[in-house]
Each structure stands twice: as structure tokens, then as C-alpha cells.
Regions:
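Flexible assembly/topogenesis modules
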Residues: 1-138
Length: 138
């Protein structure tokens, strides 16, 4: 059984830093995918694309699960200098596509232009895409 849980969190424009505490209460997901969307598109403006995941020049992203930072070194992209390969590579790590002969249909050059998603595998053995069961963390 696979469950998809979508969380929506609003970050006001112009905010320089944002810390979100206790985003998940109860059972932790196996995987967390983070994307940023313009609020006008999210709220239904038909001139905007709600699937345009822009980077908004963010320059630091990481998660903490039980006081453990994921990934161990935060993602620090610099989109103005085209230095975002670790963020792009998180799509492969976080979706279980690393070290496989499979892709995700998002090229490195397309990533900052509407496909800026970051994925994190939250399982203890980094097996969110495998078929075996993991201990459920609460």
C-alpha cells in the first residue's frame, strides 16, 4: 500500500530564511520531495502554470529528522552561477534511481527552468524505492 501525502506551506515573498518545525506529526514518510510554486499559480491563476517548480534563487536546503540532518551536507545551490548539481542529483538519490539504468526525464539544463525539485530518502537504509518493508518511524 502506497500513500501520498501532500503538504502545502506558504512562504511569503521576500523572506530570507524559513525554518519549518514539525511538518510531519506521526508516521514519517519514506521519501520527501520539495518544490516551490508561485502562489498565484497555486491559487488558480490560469495565466500561471502550477507545475512550474521554480528555484526562486534559494541557496540552502536540508531536512532534520530526529535531530539528524538529511543530507549530511546541506544542498547549497547557486543558480546565478549554474552550480546546482547536488540539488539536481538529489532527484536520483531521493527517488531510488541512483546507480540504476533509469532516468527521471529531467535534464540538468532543464532543472532550473521549472523542474527544480529536491528529493530526500528518509529510510534508514536508503531503500525508499525497494520492495522490502522498513520499520515505521513515528
Amino acid at each position: 500500500i502506497t500513500r501520498v501525502d501532500v503538504k502545502t506551506i506558504t512562504i511569503a515573498s521576500g523572506v530570507q530564511a524559513k525554518t519549518l518545525d514539525n511538518v510531519y506529526l506521526g508516521q514519517l514518510p519514506k521519501r520527501c520531495i520539495i518544490g516551490f510554486v508561485d502562489s498565484r499559480a497555486f491559487n488558480g491563476n490560469i495565466q500561471r502554470n502550477p507545475y512550474n517548480f521554480a528555484h526562486f534563487n534559494h541557496n540552502f536546503l536540508c531536512l532534520y529528522v530526529d535531530s539528524v540532518q538529511i543530507p549530511s551536507k546541506p544542498l547549497t545551490p547557486d543558480f546565478s552561477k549554474n552550480q546546482y548539481i547536488r540539488s539536481y542529483h538529489s532527484l536520483f538519490d531521493g527517488c531510488g534511481l541512483n546507480f540504476t539504468d533509469a532516468g527521471n526525464c529531467i535534464s540538468r539544463s532543464d532543472y532550473p527552468h521549472g523542474f527544480c525539485l529536491s528529493a530526500f530518502d528518509l529510510t534508514a537504509d536508503l531503500s525508499c524505492n525497494d520492495s522490502h518493508w522498513n520499520i515505521i518511524e513515528i
